[in-house]
Amino acid sequence: MSKKSLASLSSADISGKRALVRVDFNVPVDDQGKITDDTRIRAALPTIQDLTQKGAKVILASHFGRPKGVDDKLRLTPVAKRLSELLGQEVIKTDDSIGDEVAAKVAALQNGQVLLLENVRFYPEEEKNDAEFAKKLAANADFYVNDAFGTAHRAHASTEGVTKFLSPSVAGYLVEKELQYLQNAIENPQRPLAAIIGGSKVSSKIGVIETLLEKCDKLIIGGGMIFTFYKARGLSVGKSLVEEDKLELAKSLEAKAKERGVALLLPTDVVLADNFAPDANSQTVSIENIPDGWMGLDIGPDSVKFFQEALADTKTVIWNGPMGVFEFDKFAAGTEAIAHTLAEIGKTGTTTIIGGGDSVAAVEKVGLADQMSHISTGGGASLELLEGKVLPGIAALDDA
């Protein structure tokens, strides 16, 4: 899926032209509306700065939250302010994403100026990928850049619909980097390739586990979903989370791994709690000895050693999903140990890819984000790409 990228456009191609850039500025904010983490805004800077330096007029479009119609609490005003600080130049803000006010402000733009449209999801037509709305969004621009990997798995007006009206339609630097790392890891990895899949439910990770069984040399499973595998093996799991309707699936995944010669590794010990709370009583036991009335909330120290040994000779590692309930400090050790392990093996040339979602938060929590080869900005989009699915927002871009 090789796509035309912004890097292929020179100053001569785009100077004075109006660029509609889809970014993902869906950042977390506190009760006062202050941004608590600007990672997503900073992630878009290389694309925005390249466009301004090449003399384009930059029009940014993003969603923010899940508004039902216009919602003053979900306006992009704090984002415009933060982006202005990061760019060191004024970011012009509109109160709408289409219409006369937008057209007038775009017409007044000088080369190298940046304008941020209001939250595109104020219009229900955005998520319906309405062609008329897409046409209105596109009307103010000459070409299109998609740098919002986090929404690339959605066929919305600002991610897919606008490409029908704007040419060229290219990938921004963030999207290009995501595709390069995630697709390479699946299609052409340095081996041995290991995947670490965590999270609470097998059901949400079935697709990715099945695809990775075709590609991986080792598959490490952690998080709440391990108990469905244990129960399928006939072990007692106390009151741990189990998806009863997925027991047969767990058996078939283990059988499939065996058949394909893939090492499917489950934890050997677990940290138990007497209830689901940050201050619960805890004990560590082997997986054969889980007593009634207790639930597993993390992997144990022996499992950490077992996984570290399995990862020692790998050349590529993809990690998606935590090993336990890392939001509770008492049950965060397993997840944090995996983060430290990846940072260590990364120093000796192993490519370490953090595939979006909670594992990103975990790596950031322990301050190791800058020691990973690549941290994906997309949760659902990363998973779907790892599953081998076509992402509509990427498919719609011009081929390289």
Swiss-Prot record:
Keywords: ATP-binding, Cytoplasm, Glycolysis, Kinase, Nucleotide-binding, Transferase
Subcellular location: Cytoplasm
Binding annotation for substrate: D24, F25, N26, R40, H63, F64, G65, R66, R121, R154
Coiled coil: none
Enzyme Commission number: 2.7.2.3
Annotated Gene3D superfamilies: Phosphoglycerate kinase, N-terminal domain (3.40.50.1260)
Domain of life: Bacteria
Annotated GO biological process: gluconeogenesis; glycolytic process
InterPro entries assigned to the protein according to its UniProt record, in alphabetical order: Phosphoglycerate_kinase (IPR001576), Phosphoglycerate_kinase_N (IPR015824), Phosphoglycerate_kinase_sf (IPR036043)
GO cellular component: cytosol
Catalytic reactions of this protein: (2R)-3-phosphoglycerate + ATP = (2R)-3-phospho-glyceroyl phosphate + ADP
Signal peptide, first to last residue: none
Pathway this chain belongs to: Carbohydrate degradation; glycolysis; pyruvate from D-glyceraldehyde 3-phosphate: step 2/5
Bilayer-spanning residue ranges: none
Binding site residues for ATP: K205, G296, E327, G356, G357, D358, S359
GO MF terms held by the record: ADP binding; ATP binding; phosphoglycerate kinase activity
Protein family per UniProt: Belongs to the phosphoglycerate kinase family.
Assembly notes: Monomer.
Stored PANTHER family: PHOSPHOGLYCERATE KINASE (PTHR11406), PHOSPHOGLYCERATE KINASE 1, CHLOROPLASTIC-RELATED (PTHR11406:SF23)
Protein name: Phosphoglycerate kinase
UniProt organism field: Nostoc punctiforme (strain ATCC 29133 / PCC 73102)
Gene that encodes the chain: pgk
